[in-house]
Design a protein with these regions (language model features):
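Membrane-helix interface segments
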Residues: 84, 113, 140-144
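Hydrophobic alpha-helical transmembrane segments and immediately flanking/interface helices
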Residues: 112-134
Length: 209
């Protein structure tokens, strides 16, 4: 399935994250920037993008995979091309591209947001890979959406109580040293989950009558 058909088949579900990331977040950052306080600007960009951009990546995967997993007669979608990983990766790239221009604008305010954008890309890749994997593992899109939601809550809200070791939330922004150490493991985890998802996809045989 081509990327245009994939987006069209999702309807407004695809555009909800785009509108949020490309309209609401920049609008909030714009109003914060008017205060002239660099700390507040950095805090707004870091908190809002880390809370919502990766999770919405997971949301897009769920909306796209629903027709393959949950709909009646879903076997028809697996006749010509059973493996859906290439569709997921195309959606991931389009989603990232729609957000890149805004981070370029944020970099005009603070060049360090370039590292933050790499951080967001890595974490979003992890969310996308995990959701793709869980769709076939649980054989349910609804169940597949839960881990990403819980991980977001753990990282952003439960940080003080459960520790920082597995959290992706970086309230003070991203540092090059941390990006090249801790987040290498995030990339590896994302690749492993995508590979497991591929294997589960290839062996998938649950078709709804």
């Amino acid at each position: 399935m081509g990327i245009k058909i994939s987006i069209k088949s999702m309807g407004m579900s695809f555009y909800i994250p785009i509108i949020f990331n490309s309209l609401l977040i920049p609008l909030i950052v714009f109003f914060v920037a008017r205060t002239g306080n660099e700390y507040n600007i950095a805090f707004a960009v870091n908190v809002l993008t880390q809370m919502f951009t990766p999770f919405f990546g997971s949301f897009i995967v769920c909306m796209h995979m629903s027709k393959y997993i949950d709909t009646r007669g879903n076997e028809i979608y697996f006749v010509l091309n059973k493996n859906k990983s290439h569709e997921i990766m195309k959606l991931f790239l389009v989603y990232i591209m729609t957000n890149t221009c805004w981070f370029a604008a944020y970099m005009l305010l603070d060049r360090s947001f370039g590292l933050e954008w790499l951080h967001i890309i890595i974490v979003t890749f992890l969310f996308v890979s995990a959701t793709y994997c869980f769709c076939f593992f649980f054989r349910s899109v609804s169940l597949a959406s839960i881990p990403g939601f819980l991980y977001t809550i753990y990282s952003v809200v439960g940080l003080k109580y459960l520790g920082k070791k597995f959290s992706y939330y970086e309230q003070t922004g991203m540092e090059a040293e941390k990006l090249s150490s801790k987040y290498v493991y995030f990339i590896i985890a994302a690749i492993v989950l995508m590979s497991i998802g591929n294997a589960l996809n290839d062996s998938y045989d649950k078709y709804n009558e």
